[in-house]
């Protein structure tokens, strides 16, 4: 059960007594997050985020705590919630709450609480002072959608009928928020200078809204910064996926057959993760380019219908829906392990198993028994396995992602008038800056171009070194 502080109700955490433990781990993480620490040193005195009120929706982990404290060190005020019901690290949330930042996050929170907490991070008003959020930092798009749909409802529009429990709770929370604070979300949307979005799924939502001409403020697509997608998505998953599967099941990967659905950056890292553990890896793909990449990396590319007959472990990494169906799971081997490393829980038809016998082995590990007696293991109920069953990506790779997020927030706050209501990526020179900030920690020494060499290839001596269309 969540506990509240005696002197304030402006946070919800599992146990505020975990704050000291959280602070110790935050201190360690700071030594592995050179990009964020460099931004504190560079911008701390100038306070470029002074006056910014950031509504943040992103996994409440130790690494996110370092991001939050970087934003506040640069002058921002922050209200924070997690973006996944299983991803919170309770000691991290406690440490941030104890520092005075309003945070609403409990590992294993209900969907009802999740959406109520999204409402809490938008409620900036104190004593009817009229304050609202003026920036959003999002992961998956839930906070952005809450604000946009809130403004639409206040304008008299209606939402489509909910199709699942998630949508039921979102609509309930929105209506409750509007009833308590009518007109406030409309005012909020007008005040927002922009949103920076962390992940592939959220970026897809933003592009969809922008294509319809309905995006009311600029958005920065952090996910497609090279120092995010080619590092967090690839190298992060390469380390965190097998960590989660092993913590959840104690399975020996060596010799097993594993299937990865999707061979984008996350799928590439996941497939390498499993292969490095000794598994024989199959890949499913819809895209001929990604399928060819997988084949030339030595992976066997098959359909899911074939994979279910052969595999012991299944990982979805597509960002799509119904990738593993109830029929697929019914055809799997006894004690097959099924999990997802995409942002939402739509990739595996978990709801279709609701009427079968579920046995919780431990938190985020369930045995599901089919009518014929066969069982499969479901991790994190089909939600993000690396954050549900483990602690997510290592601090170092998250430093690159969160340095991008911080730079995006500075860009939106200080230069928003230079952006239209569209989706942008950070300029190449900032992408290269993020990479450069992480080299010393690894002992990397860059070669410097001479002026003659720079002229020869047509780039500045100090960069940027690649055109925007270059594919790393």
UniProtKB/Swiss-Prot annotation:
Write down what this protein is called. Answer: Adenosylhomocysteinase
A GO CC term assigned to this protein in UniProt: cytosol
**Which NCBIfam families does the UniProt record give?**
ahcY, PRK05476.2-3
- Give its localization: Cytoplasm
Provide the family line.
Belongs to the adenosylhomocysteinase family.
Q: Which pathway does this chain act in?
A: Amino-acid biosynthesis; L-homocysteine biosynthesis; L-homocysteine from S-adenosyl-L-homocysteine: step 1/1
Q: Which GO terms describe its biological process?
A: L-homocysteine biosynthetic process; one-carbon metabolic process; S-adenosylmethionine cycle
A single GO molecular-function term is: adenosylhomocysteinase activity
